[in-house]
Every structure is written in C-alpha cells, then in structure tokens.
Amino acid sequence: MTLALFHNLTLASMTDGPTPYGLMPKGALVAEAGQVLWSGPQAELPAAFAAVPAHDLGRRLVTPALIDCHTHVVHGGNRANEFEMRLNGASYEEVARAGGGIVSTVSATRTATEAELLASALPRVDAMIAEGVAVIEVKSGYGLDIETELRMLRAARAIGQHRDVTIRTSFLGAHAVPADFAGRADAYIDTVAIPALRTAHAEGLVDAVDGFCEGIAFQPEQIARVFDVARDLGLPMKLHAEQLSNLGGTKLAASYGALSADHIEYLDEDGVAAMARAGMTAVILPGAFYTLRETQKPPVALLRKHRVPMAVSTDANPGSSPMTSLLLAMNMACTLFRLTPEEALAGTTRNAARALGMADRGTLAPGQRADLAVWDVAHPAELAYRIGFNPLYKRIIGGTL
C-alpha cells in the first residue's frame, strides 16, 4: 500500500490527554490505506518512514476533518418568506395559517423528484465541504409519507456518490404529524412511520433512527413504538429531545441505549445523569436556538459535571436553522452557551463521531481514518474565534491529496 508522510505542521490530534487539543507544534503524520499509521512529534518520526513520499504543509494547522452530525440538508423548497413574515410581526399561528411552517417544507418535498432533492442538497453539502467537513449526517422527516421518506433517504445516499464525503442517514419518520393525520398521531406511527422504517431498512437506506419527542410532535410512548422496531432491526437510535419542554424524551432515549439526545435546552439533571449512565452524547444545536430566539440554554454545566460528551452541529434545515456553516456553529456554541474553543472543536470532531457511532473518526490517532483538515491558522482556537471567515487550506481524505 502507498504510504504518505505529512510534515512541517502543527498537529491538533483531538485525542484525550494532558495537552489541550492534543496539540503538537512541530508534528507529523503518516497515512497508509486510508488510515493514520503514525502521528506524533516530527523529531520522533521513526526511521522506517524516512523514505516515504513527503508532503510539506507549510507549518499549517492540521485537525481531523470536521463532522456535521445533525442535518436536514435534503428537502424541497425554502422558507425565506416565513422569515420575512415573522420579522414583520406575524405570529407562528399566522404563518401556519398562511401555509407555512413544516407543512410548507413537506409540500415542497413531496412534489420533488429524487433528482431534484439531490440537486438542491448538493450546494448545501458543497458549502459544508468547503469548511473542512468530511462526514455529514442527513435525516429524512420532510416526507411524512412512505414514498417521500424513502425518496429523501435515496437522495441522501446519492450525495455520497456525487461528492467526496461520507453520508450517514437517519430515518426521521416520527418528525411531525402531517396534516392528513391531524389528531391521529398513533395512526400515523402505525401506518406510516413504522412501515416506512421497515421498508427503508430493507433497502439499506438507514444508518440510525431518530424522532422528535415534543408536545408539538410525538409523545414518549409513541417514540418508544418506533424505537422498539429500530431495536428489533439492530439500528442505533438518537432523539430530538427537550428542545421546547421536558417530556422525558432523553430518559427514554437513554433507556434504549441511544447514541445521542439533540437540542436538550430543557434537560434537567436527572436526564443528564441518565445520559451519562447510558454513554450518550449531547448534541448542541446553537443555530436553532439563535434563529428561534430562544432563551432557555442547554445545561452545559451539568453536562460537564456528569462528563457527558458534547457535540456541536449546524442542524441545517429550512425552518429553524437555515445555516450550513459548522465554523459558525462552533462560534455560536462558544458565544451563546460558553463552550470553550477546545470543547467546540471536540464537538465537531471526536464527539460528533461518537454521536454517530463512528469509532474510526474524529481524532488523528493511529488506526483512525486519515481524513484531515488543513487550516491557514496558527492555533485551533482561531477556528471558533473568527466569524464569517473560512481559513481552510485543503481537505485530505483518506490520506490522499
């Protein structure tokens, strides 16, 4: 197999250890067959690698490539008109009566072909790739009928065939109750969400199962019925939970050994402790908090107290978080929620990988996937510090320039 040596760089390996960021000011890295074979101080490079083809990275910063672990980039239409309506004083109910809200996105998504869904998603994905992202989680959930949910997942899978990025799909059939099932959430779960999940799994379209546990969406017992099927199918789970109220969704997710609970603004200490016991990751989504002008913040201090890993993501979606910048999400997590820059970078590398169950991503330790982001900055704190500035020099995927 071809070896590649990357040297003359500042390495932020993001491994656990005594040094913040796993930082090595004069580092080097050897890749082979898509994996990190060796990383460490350049002065300690083993002699066996002396003749390996070398790439001088000009003293730039190298981190693991970024991971956006919670997105809705596949959808039809946009909701810019609602943004304007709200700023002109329209209430949520007035927007909904005018055909807005999730109903608008569901309608636009149901009428879009798979090719159209893919074509509209690719520019969003390109914006993420341009900021050093190598893994993107993509959810369904804007079809809310069997065929459209499948079409969304097929379009998500197709992204990975058109771009050099790893796609992880999440089935989100339990996202909202569609208008044609108004007042019949149980019937929707039984006749649409669960059959769609079984069919999508049979087609190999599902990497994980998600849901939205909230008063405006589904109750814990309804989510549990979907999770029972996910468990029977051997699929990992995650959950939108405690965003607008505390319904106990996080405790439910913990009882199923879920990978993550996402949003969690209203999570209490009992829920945090349940996450810790279950080994879950907390996914922080500052874009939605900002866009919705929320005031209840995620319990960051409690998450630290109970040592629950925190991931950070864009929540890219047409309604509550119309953003694709993971660097901006990092800055927001620091500014709005008081994460440290190191926590923010861990949240888009090591802990984002945990949130997706990807044990081979997120650090630059030997045996990890050699997906690198090379930055024109001197220190990793600069990635979360600057706003509206993209210092990416290049991505290196699988150790290949």
Curated annotation (Swiss-Prot):
S-S bonds: none
Gene3D superfamilies the UniProt entry points to: Metal-dependent hydrolases, Urease, subunit C, domain 1
Reactions that this protein is recorded to catalyse: 4-imidazolone-5-propanoate + H2O = N-formimidoyl-L-glutamate
E.C. designation(s): 3.5.2.7
Cell compartment(s), UniProt: Cytoplasm
Entry's Gene Ontology molecular function annotations: imidazolonepropionase activity; iron ion binding; zinc ion binding
Main location group: cytoplasm
Cofactor: binding details: Binds 1 zinc or iron ion per subunit.
Entry keyword annotation includes Zinc: yes
Binding positions (Fe(3+)): 70, 72, 240, 315
Keyword vocabulary terms for this entry: Cytoplasm, Histidine metabolism, Hydrolase, Iron, Metal-binding, Zinc
UniProt binding sites for N-formimidoyl-L-glutamate: 142, 317, 319
Cofactor names: Zn(2+); Fe(3+)
Pathway assigned to this chain's UniProt record: Amino-acid degradation; L-histidine degradation into L-glutamate; N-formimidoyl-L-glutamate from L-histidine: step 3/3
EC category name: hydrolase
Binding locations of 4-imidazolone-5-propanoate: 79, 142, 175, 243, 320
One GO CC term, this protein: cytoplasm
Family: Belongs to the metallo-dependent hydrolases superfamily. HutI family.
Annotated function: Catalyzes the hydrolytic cleavage of the carbon-nitrogen bond in imidazolone-5-propanoate to yield N-formimidoyl-L-glutamate. It is the third step in the universal histidine degradation pathway.
UniProt protein name: Imidazolonepropionase
Organism: Ruegeria pomeroyi (strain ATCC 700808 / DSM 15171 / DSS-3)
